[in-house]
Regions:
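Active-site histidine-anchored catalytic micro-motif
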Residues: 2
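Hydrophobic helix-and-loop "lid/oligomerization" segment in the mid-to-C-terminal part
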Residues: 8-130, 135-169
């Protein structure tokens, strides 16, 4: 059940099917403690909530709906984040009106920048593949060599969003 909830985003993501819901229903009927699982999955440590505050105060968004934030290694350290725990910040910008694509830029130990890219519509994995990355159509990752290189990734995502909007109309 935990995997189903996490992978389907609490049944919000496109990968949720009748089979997904059926499996969850079966597990519920087997007596799982759904409330305890949800509490363990979604309760946030204070440092993560504080880091989310940083994200919400620092992110920028373009006219086409590409949002991003940059988090240096020093800032990550100030919030006690690790490579593993910083993933809790990836969906901070997920449900903000007008944002189609969002990118979380995290400086790694080696100075390269990890870009976690997510989408509410446009296909992003092809862009990620051009930046030493890849992934799923709406959830991908990439690597840029330095902070100055982030703009090239953002520019490509901006184009993807413009194309997406044209195709919708």
């Amino acid at each position: 059940y935990t995997g189903i909830i996490a992978d389907s985003g609490r049944f919000l993501y496109d990968n949720t099917t009748t089979a997904t819901l059926g499996a969850a229903s079966f597990l519920y009927d087997c007596g799982i403690d759904r409330n305890k699982i949800h509490e363990l999955l979604y309760r946030r440590p204070l440092n993560i909530v504080q880091a989310q505050g940083f994200v919400l105060s620092q992110f920028e968004v373009s006219e086409a709906g590409v949002a991003y934030f940059k988090m240096s290694k020093d800032v990550q350290d100030s919030y006690g984040l690790t490579t593993g725990t910083r993933s809790a910040l990836v969906n901070t910008l997920a449900n903000i009106e007008g944002i189609r694509v969002w990118v979380c830029f995290f400086e790694n130990e080696d100075g390269r920048i990890r870009a976690n890219i997510r989408s509410n519509g446009p296909i992003i994995n092809e862009v990620a593949a051009r930046f030493e990355g890849g992934g799923h159509p709406k959830a991908s990752g990439a690597i840029v060599k330095a902070w100055d290189d982030c703009q090239a990734l953002l520019d490509e995502l901006e184009q993807v969003c413009h194309t997406y909007v044209k195709e919708l109309n």
